[in-house]
Curated annotation (Swiss-Prot):
Changing P242S: In cdc2-E1-9; larval-pupal lethal. This is Cyclin-dependent kinase 1. The lineage of its organism: Eukaryota, Metazoa, Ecdysozoa, Arthropoda, Hexapoda. The modification Phosphothreonine is found at T14, T161. The modification Phosphotyrosine is found at Y15, Y160.
Length: 297
């Protein structure tokens, strides 16, 4: 640890405090994620070991790089490359009447999806995608951070706990208690983020799990066996759910062109089996004519 110094606290991560720091040897500015260990007996928590092992495997230009792992007494520090801005802060910093440039939205969506495709091909889910853990720099690069809740998945997909994704970006199969889920949970989250970039407003701002579901149902209509076979058998599905019968999504997306709307509709398909894949997102007509170079924000 003597090679690093803390400069200031910059936030609370999933497992502990995050500091801006400096490498004393190179002068490089870094992000230091401190994970407190409960006691000396327990050693490094399995959650941290999982995060470390994942991040060391995931080397990609759109994934935050883990530089080093350090132990100090009953603490572990994860040393990451430092980016000072995240997508939420960036959107919040724009004037109220200003929308993100459409080319920047396309560029960010392409980069985020490229990172997630890279993960999905390695059998890794992120499971906690949200604007707060998408870090950006001035050159137009966006990187996915905080794989704290990511986990390698095998085939068949294991039964997971379902407390994972921040409420507003949480997939319906998770909210309805599905014991098995896979890559489509990340696609749903990206669809919500895409809509938020295009409109400056979160699409489904629920304040409880049931409120979150009802907000989805109001906009996308209440799912039925016809559009989502098996939905009524999910543990938290109730026959008493209100029945909204029209899809209002297009009304929420006034700033998007027809290809953009079509892509979001495919990302927000209720049935995970039919939700678009990361690979197919990148090949969608929304990206026709798009040069995958960076767009300055």
């Amino acid at each position: 640890m003597e090679d690093f110094e803390k400069i200031e606290k910059i936030g609370e991560g999933t497992y502990g405090v995050v500091y801006k720091g400096r490498n004393r040897l190179t002068g490089q500015i870094v992000a230091m994620k401190k994970i407190r260990l409960e006691s000396d007996d327990e050693g490094v928590p399995s959650t941290a070991i999982r995060e470390i092992s994942l991040l060391k495997e995931l080397k990609h230009e759109n994934i935050v790089c883990l530089e080093d792992v350090l132990m100090e007494e009953n603490r572990i520090y994860l040393i990451f490359e430092f980016l000072s801005m995240d997508l939420k802060k960036y959107m919040d910093s724009l004037p109220v009447d200003k929308h993100m440039e459409s080319e920047l939205v396309r560029s960010y969506l392409y980069q985020i999806t490229s990172a997630i495709l890279f993960c999905h091909r390695r059998r890794v889910l992120h499971r906690d995608l949200k604007p707060q853990n998408l870090l950006i720099d001035k050159s137009g690069l966006i990187k996915v951070a905080d794989f704290g809740l990511g986990r390698s998945f095998g085939i068949p997909v294991r039964i997971y706990t379902h407390e994972i994704v921040t409420l507003w970006y949480r997939a319906p199969e998770v909210l309805l208690g599905s014991p098995r889920y896979s890559c489509p949970v990340d696609i749903w989250s990206i669809g919500c983020i895409f809509a938020e970039m295009a409109t400056r407003k979160p699409l489904f701002q629920g304040d409880s799990e049931i409120d979150q579901l009802f907000r989805m149902f109001r906009i996308l209509k209440t799912p039925t066996e016809d559009i989502w076979p098996g939905v009524t058998s999910l543990p938290d599905y109730k026959n008493t759910f209100p029945c909204w019968s029209t899809n209002q999504l297009t009304n929420q997306l006034k700033n998007l062109d027809a290809n953009g709307i079509d892509l979001i509709q495919k990302m927000l398909i209720y049935d995970p089996v039919h939700r678009i894949s990361a690979k197919d997102i990148l090949e969608h007509p929304y990206f026709n004519g798009f040069q995958s170079g960076l767009v300055r924000n």
